[in-house]
């Protein structure tokens, strides 16, 4: 992890940035931080270093702060440089390794950032992790803890959803398997891990779902989609598929049916605006639920 100095709040290129935008950024960075553990009287402290995690603009701020380093190292033809927020992956030939390592460490420290002591380095012939993926010379798969997390999340649905609301269980489970598209953005576990090549993992997850259906005596009562099919649709027919829900294509009547039949919401005498607001609110909640399955990927 790295800590961003508050100089980011006052961009050097302020001539090109509206003062109102600079003010918003600065106020966001200085957001009060809670001191844990939370007691009866919550103690707050003004943030003096770093950007709050989970802030809508946190990733954007990181991109702004790191843009010069990104440009410098992406232009080098003897390395492959990748960065996702605060996780950096560099692929380089062994003879250049120590020079590149020293240079990027120096550049990062010049920005006032702190390198995480937990750094991984090694040969690409060995297995290594990046963003929850496990990469080696034969395949790309998902690390065991991330697989366990989605398995536990699926089982929790079976445990907590009452059997008298089978439609809700089927809907939630299928969303977890296929993910969905909303406002042109893709959400879901398999969307995040769509670059895997380890198809045996997907067959394993489908098998886990079938075993849970059998354990909870739901054979023939619910129609569940498959990870294997979803993976194929993502790679071969994403823009035409009906298998993965594109909620942007739903008509008003479709949204009403989902709200009333699945979420058991009374829509009597409710107008179109109410339906749109409630549907959007519920699907934002589903996004938060799905994103829990891919949290803590660093």
What residue spans do the PLM features occupy?
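Polymerase palm active-site segment centered on the conserved acidic dipeptide of motif C
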Residues: 80-83, 91-164
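A structural signal for alpha-helix termini and helix-coil/disorder junctions
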Residues: 6, 10, 14, 27, ...
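Conserved polymerase palm-domain catalytic core
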Residues: 1-85, 89-103, 113, 122-127, ...
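A sequence-level detector of short, solvent-exposed, charge-rich linear segments
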Residues: 23, 27, 40, 44, ...
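Active-site and adjacent loop segments of nucleotide-processing enzymes
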Residues: 135-298
